[in-house]
Each structure stands twice: as structure tokens, then as C-alpha cells.
Amino acid sequence: MDIDLLKRTPSSYLGSCRYKLPEISEDRETFDKIFKILDDLDIKYFFYIGGNDSMDTIKKLSDYAIVTGSDIKFMGVPKTIDNDLAVTDHTPGFGSAAKFIAATMKEIIRDGLVYDYPTVTIVEIMGRNAGWLTAAAALAKSDDCEGVDLIYLPEKVFDIDHFMARVKEIAAKGRSMVIAVSEGIKVADGRYVFELSEHVEFVDAFGHKQLAGSAKFLANKIGAELGIKTRAIELSTLQRCAAHMTSRTDITEAYNVGGAAVKAAFEGETGKVVVLKRVSDDPYMCITETNDVHQIANIEKKVCLLYTSPSPRDPKTS
């Protein structure tokens, strides 16, 4: 097998699914069917790659294996651009997506400088409840770029009046601005910002609302109330499939966590998730460990508010 080629093969080769397993107490029949298929195919090792929902699947399958006395080993392998898995330092996929977002934001900022009058560009970034990807927009700040003007994470309640006041304040200085918003920002009553406009809701198999439209809603509001030329940009699928921006560290660590999962399963472990443990910042180094899936499944690691500051042009994010 050509490992180097495998490392650079799009994950779409493996396929994906969005299927939520029921609780064992509510539907044993579904689990019986799954285990029958695994037994018929003589599958003894089951590796599931993904984020929170995937780890929930590993938890349920490994629990059922214990209940029924099955010797199949179930291991979770972390992979999510959301970076919201508990325990692990970070997740493979996040670094590449963050790299794409930082570079894209810098290019959008440059584009806005072409105008000699104030404009607003609102960029909507993935992140339902955790704002790690949106916070990555702060990485656009560098010696040759002042960075984005405002960043809004789902960890904080979104105040529309305060938002409009900040936009008006920046526009009064006569310059264009770029704003990064998480798709999952909510107002005080718990509604997503995109729900403030007429919207047909779509809910996936895990009960998650399809999030999109917050940037467009805010852009329309700014245009209507402040009369400023405003555009909304949804990075959408691009932030998770931009292979030209893949992080080398991501490739290495994805390979490492996969290999660690196989090794652990062969050594008899089950109901575990491989995690990355940082042992050094300079030079950067992470090692792999395994952790009980019950301490990870359905637990979201959110951005600590201590990381935030009033202005993303400061060292911290807004």
C-alpha cells in the first residue's frame, strides 16, 4: 500500500453517513441487525472516524457489545473541523480549515480596501455551538494586515443593537470593515440569528437545524437601516474541502491517530477514542493516548471566554 498516496487521498473515498442510533433501551432490534451484519462479515474491529455524533455511535455500539458479550472492538478516531471534541488537545481537520479561513479572510480584507467609501463584508463561518473556526479568523492579523474588525462566536449571546452600533461606529471613520460571524450565533431568547428572518427549517437525522443565513440577515439589516453597501459571504463547504490549504500537521496527526486506534484495538482496547495530548508548545509536539468514549461522546468543547477581547485586532479574538 502506498501510504504517502493514502495520506493525500480525499476522505470522500471512505464515504460518510448521517444516521443516529437509537438508545439501546428503546430499540435493541437495530443493534441486533448491526451486530448480525458484523458477525456475518467476520468483522472484529470497528473504527469510526468523526466528531461528536460519531463518538456517540461508538459509545452505543461498544456498550451493546458489553451487554451481549460480543468480542468486537470499537474505537473512535477523531476528525472534525469544528474542533469541539472534549479531552483531546484538538482534532485533525481543524488546522486545515483554520488555515483556509485565515487566508481567505486576509484576501477578503484586501479586496475591501479597493473602495474609497465604507463597505461591510460579513463572512459566515461554520460552528453550531463552538466558535473555534470563527475565532480562526483572527489569524488574518499580521504585519501586513490589520485583521478583521469584529468577530462573533456562538459562546456569547448576540446583541443585535450592540452589533449595529459597532458597525455604525466603524463606518463613521470612513473605512470598510470585515466581520466574521459564526453560523450558530444566537440572540438572548435562544433563537439563531438566521431564524429572525423567514426561513424554512431543515433538521438532520441528529435533530440539528441546518444553519445558514445569519450573515445574509445581518447584511440586509445593515443595508436597510444604515444605508451602507454590505455583502454576505458563506464559506460553507469550501472551509472543509479546500485540499490546496491542507495543513501538513493535520496530515501527520490524522495518520497518527488512525494508527494509534488500530494498535489499541489489536491490543484489546474497546470503547475508547484516540486523543491528542500536547506535550510541548515550542517546539510543537503532540502524542496520542486513548480515552474512555463516555468522557467524550456528546460533550462539546467550547471556546473559553477568557480567550476573547473587545477587539479582534488585539492579540485575542473578539
Q: Where do the protein language model's features map onto the residues?
A:
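Glycine-rich oxoanion-binding loops at beta->alpha junctions
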Residues: M1-I43, D53, K106
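A glycine-rich phosphate-binding loop feature that marks nucleotide/adenosyl-phosphate handling sites
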Residues: I122-N129, S236-R240, V275-M285
